From Swiss-Prot:
EC number of the protein: 2.3.1.184
Organism, scientific name: Aliivibrio fischeri (Vibrio fischeri)
Protein name per the record: Acyl-homoserine-lactone synthase
Pfam families: Autoind_synth (PF00765)
The keyword Transferase appears for this protein: yes
Name of the gene encoding the protein in the UniProt record: luxI
Superkingdom field: Bacteria
Length: 193
């Protein structure tokens, strides 16, 4: 199977690919993880799917979306700042044109694993966010994520550290943390072979 990585902003994304992203997010977040989300027609979207959003996503040979990220600038409204500010403790929410929030990371359940650790799609998506950061002058990503993803990042050696109050919070049924992922040589080595 050939995997194509694509990037688009909200206003330019082809409608079928956008629908594929929302369908995958529904499958992962609503069906698999059972998050309490408002969905319509088996598609998951929220108020952050707007003109500020960018998407990096993977499509297979048949143009099915098999993985995705949503990227939001920290200079406007974004999830950590507006939905989960309690995770920051006494720290202010990042507000910097060179810091971007990653959210809604999803990979299809049928992605085959390589080296018993990560799917090819997952690794290509991490490579893509690294390359995107370098090309756009992004120095850091921030994300509200699960402790399982935190462990995964450490296993594949993507640099990350907790920010905010640095505590584990239970969001729904998910143990969650806020992470910073600096764009540096360690990130490059972790995702580029």
């Amino acid at each position: 199977m050939t995997i194509m990585i694509k990037k688009s902003d909200f206003l330019a994304i082809p409608s079928e690919e956008y629908k594929g992203i929302l369908s995958l997010r529904y499958q992962v977040f609503k069906q698999r993880l059972e998050w309490d989300l408002v969905v319509e027609n088996n598609l998951e979207s929220d108020e952050y799917d707007n003109s500020n959003a960018e998407y990096i996503y993977a499509c297979d040979d048949t143009e099915n979306v098999s993985g995705c990220w949503r990227l939001l600038p920290t200079t406007g409204d974004y999830m950590l700042k507006s939905v989960f500010p309690e995770l920051l403790g006494q720290q202010s929410a990042p507000k910097d044109p060179n810091i971007v929030e990653l959210s809604r990371f999803a990979v299809g359940k049928n992605s085959s694993k390589i080296n018993n650790s990560a799917s090819e799609i997952t690794m290509k998506l991490f490579e893509a966010i690294y390359k995107h950061a370098v090309s756009q002058g992004i120095t850091e990503y921030v994300t509200v994520t699960s402790t399982a993803i935190e462990r995964f990042l450490k296993r594949i050696k993507v640099p990350c550290h907790r920010i905010g109050d640095k505590e584990i919070h239970v969001l729904g049924d998910t143990k969650s943390v806020v992470l910073s992922m600096p764009i540096n040589e360690q990130f490059k080595k972790a995702v580029l072979n």
